[in-house]
């Protein structure tokens, strides 16, 4: 039976100094050595609306840990707001922050010999960073996020009422047909509350995936940040981690450990969910990284196979259903992630050999929490009725509105059954060809089916900034393929998100008339024919470095291919002309020492853009 890790610092005469410091930090002497130490990894910051409300959350979780018999020790990680960092040099730091967050959690837990971990995350790189840390540490862990923002609603000057999200504010800003007065109303109402942005963007996608992989409680990905139900979720997460801690240290039950929950089968189920809900392409990057931390063999090949068999069952903003736009509050009303998992399970698309921090089996999980099947508990039914308050608020659990009815319409509602899927093909796809030998990814749920096959001339850009300039000065025309290179993990460095180029294409009316291909990545808010993660990246000698203006590129989503229509002899000539120097031309960019350190070990996106520590020797 394993001993508490904390015994290292709580037992023995030689640890009198450590115990003295614990007493000084507020731990009752009688608890030292008797109760498990629970690390509470918070990510509160005033920079990010998805995290501004997390200071009191840390206290709620800590108090619940104490009440459940543990010693809570809260600390904070950094948290970058991708929306604010977008479109300038700040975005270079976003993806590298994932590794810093993972390392900081590891450092704090290992330095202080914590017995278990609660991760209070929310936005884009924070959940993936903490997930990597949890799988690396492999101690009892529960994730609980800050929750999604409510969708926005604006009354325009002409009286029209629009539902909104952050991406609307970005794309409409370059639409010359919209007045300054309406732009201001959109800006003021696009993000009305605290929480992670209201669509199925990266933050919400990842918080939903922690549910599917089994490391968080039902509702983690969909209960609104403003709702009182979220407070109950925090308290339950604290009680759950104490239960897992006792099962591991007192009953020798290692099934509760993250690596025994996040198994290959669990990764497969999480990816099936991701494809079905049309999640952010960033999730592919983060799941690849997490699989490596879990020492699970799971890569693009497995993801590609699933993308051919799992249909699209939900279209949530920025993806648009034919009749309306859905947001996370609508996913919640339809039964949340358990409802999606239930539909996949009834379609025979999930592996049943999994368990979670809250249920011993998938069958038990769905029986209790899926309102569309089985016999859901009263607690589950109550949870899914939690509704938006429709009042501007930066405070957590500030409202307790409830839906009168749930959306259980599997034929025409937010979440569809396999028989009534939005499309037979899932919401994400992996493409391969001579332009991306090791693969690239596209969110098919956000692509109009009329352009699932596309061919056009390349407009080559050596940076995101050059692409933006060309789009805004009408150098990109209908039918073009915008190629943005040297924006990969190594070449950027940092693998920037290309939300501004895609938003500007949309704002200029080219969202269904152009394609964009890059070795960088996309925001979860991206829609359109936006193909990212081209691997190998340009800086690593990928074919994307050889593209020239006017080259024709053919994209075929149904057949999962992407081809640069230039013969091999010409590509060889171009490669020889580069003489082994793969670097952007005429790009003026300041790269700090911190970013250079990241670039020195960064792998391409098909490996999750993780650090290759073997390069350290």
Curated annotation (Swiss-Prot):
Task: Cite the entry's keywords alphabetically.
Answer: 2Fe-2S, Amino-acid biosynthesis, Branched-chain amino acid biosynthesis, Iron, Iron-sulfur, Lyase, Magnesium, Metal-binding
Swiss-Prot/TrEMBL catalytic activity = (2R)-2,3-dihydroxy-3-methylbutanoate = 3-methyl-2-oxobutanoate + H2O; (2R,3R)-2,3-dihydroxy-3-methylpentanoate = (S)-3-methyl-2-oxopentanoate + H2O
Q: Which Pfam families match?
A: ILV_EDD_C (PF24877), ILVD_EDD_N (PF00920)
Is the Repeat keyword given for this protein?
Answer: no
| GO MF terms, alphabetically ordered | 2 iron, 2 sulfur cluster binding; dihydroxy-acid dehydratase activity; hydro-lyase activity; magnesium ion binding
Question: Which residues are listed for Mg(2+) binding in this entry?
Answer: 82, 124-125, 497
> Does the keyword section mention Iron-sulfur?
yes
Q: What is its EC number?
A: 4.2.1.9
Pathway linked to the protein: Amino-acid biosynthesis; L-isoleucine biosynthesis; L-isoleucine from 2-oxobutanoate: step 3/4; Amino-acid biosynthesis; L-valine biosynthesis; L-valine from pyruvate: step 3/4
Q: Which residues bind [2Fe-2S] cluster?
A: 123, 197
Protein's GO biological process:
isoleucine biosynthetic process; L-valine biosynthetic process
Q: Name one GO cellular component term.
A: cytosol
Per the entry, which co-factors are needed? [2Fe-2S] cluster; Mg(2+)
Q: Which HAMAP family match?
A: IlvD
Family of this protein: Belongs to the IlvD/Edd family.
Protein name per Swiss-Prot or TrEMBL: Dihydroxy-acid dehydratase
The gene name reads: ilvD
